């Protein structure tokens, strides 16, 4: 009888396993058109770009955060937009809706942490072919930062010359309370398609209220998330937290004192790993920075720093956010 019960529960859990979006055979050379990034398995991911008036001095591949999409790099209420600002500074800027987000297929389903890292790497390779002999940079926001870390620390990293990690998603299981880990596992394996809204958490992502209101009205911005998608994101954050100290290119790590999304303790642990090999690695801490700092009311200050870092990773940042950044991060009150 006990054996039958065990088989029953095993079958039940298997039927409720976390779902990952399907992929096709990798039989296509990735390519980009005006509005599409065609992946190696034949999926059409929506893309957008902002180009400079003259020959670009650099190419930027921007990777959005969880539940967001490429619009996050465009002009938004009360913020100038990463794409337009960097294009005006001389960069060709590209962004895409990662699979499962925005206008891309399988919206709401977790695409798999290795798959979205592969998509980033393939897009970077495609841009490298399109713009030979021009530096290629990557900017990743939250989940996008975790994607970049995972791709760049793989056995076959893409040809990126420098990276900017904006409040990267490093809230790994090792930095979570045990109760959170248990609840996440149970939720993902018993009711994976359930969509808790998170409205009762009371967390604020930015001081740009008009931008937040605009996002809340945007049908492409995901407001209710499947539990198994959160589970998949946590797998990605595990990889990012484990590998952030292995970034092989000059990298700028940004974090804000008012970030209510990625906990400070997880960030401190990640930053210590990140600086274990300090050559080419910089940290900037913004006293007035929120999680969506590239869309905050003070976003332009951060964008000026990013531009300065990409032009010369060894020079101090114009804002001074890199001065005593780690000490200020560790002593900041939350």
Where in the sequence are the language-model features?
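Alpha/beta-hydrolase-fold enzymes
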Residues: 141-226
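Conserved alpha/beta-hydrolase
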Residues: 81-105
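Catalytic nucleophile-loop/oxyanion-hole region of alpha/beta-hydrolase
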Residues: 72, 78, 99-135
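Catalytic active-site module of serine/aspartate enzymes centered on a nucleophile-bearing elbow/loop
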Residues: 280, 284-334
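The serine-hydrolase catalytic nucleophile loop
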Residues: 66-82, 265
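N-terminal cap/lid segment of alpha/beta-hydrolase-fold proteins
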Residues: 19-55
């Amino acid at each position: 009888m006990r054996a039958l019960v065990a088989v029953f529960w095993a079958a039940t859990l298997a039927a409720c396993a976390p779902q990952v979006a399907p992929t096709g055979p990798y039989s296509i050379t990735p390519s980009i058109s005006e509005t599409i990034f065609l992946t190696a398995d034949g999926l059409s991911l929506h893309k957008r770009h902002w180009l400079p008036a003259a020959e670009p001095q650099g190419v930027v591949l921007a990777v959005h955060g969880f539940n967001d999409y490429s619009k996050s790099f465009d002009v938004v209420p009360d913020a100038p937009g990463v794409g337009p600002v960097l294009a005006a500074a001389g960069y060709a800027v590209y962004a895409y809706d990662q699979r499962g987000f925005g206008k891309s297929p399988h919206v709401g389903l977790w695409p798999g942490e290795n798959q979205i890292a592969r998509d980033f790497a393939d897009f970077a390779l495609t841009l490298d072919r399109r713009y030979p002999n021009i530096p290629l940079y990557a900017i990743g926001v939250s989940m996008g930062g975790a994607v970049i870390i995972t791709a760049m620390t793989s056995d076959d990293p893409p040809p990126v010359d420098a990276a900017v990690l904006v409040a990267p998603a490093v809230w790994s299981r090792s930095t979570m309370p045990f109760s959170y880990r248990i609840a996440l596992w149970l939720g993902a394996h018993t009711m994976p398609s359930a969509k808790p809204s998170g409205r009762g958490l009371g967390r604020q992502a930015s001081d740009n209220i008009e931008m937040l209101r605009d996002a809340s009205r945007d049908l492409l911005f995901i407001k209710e998330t499947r539990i198994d998608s959160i589970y998949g994101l946590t797998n990605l954050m595990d990889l990012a937290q484990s590998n952030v100290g292995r970034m092989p290119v000059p990298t700028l790590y940004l974090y804000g004192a008012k970030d209510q999304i990625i906990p400070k303790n997880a960030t401190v642990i990640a930053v210590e790993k990140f600086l274990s090999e300090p050559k080419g690695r910089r940290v900037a801490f913004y006293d007035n920075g929120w999680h969506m700092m590239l869309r905050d009311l003070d976003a332009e200050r951060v964008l000026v720093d990013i531009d300065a870092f990409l032009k010369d990773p060894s020079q101090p940042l114009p804002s001074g956010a890199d001065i005593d950044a780690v000490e200020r991060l560790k002593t900041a009150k939350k």
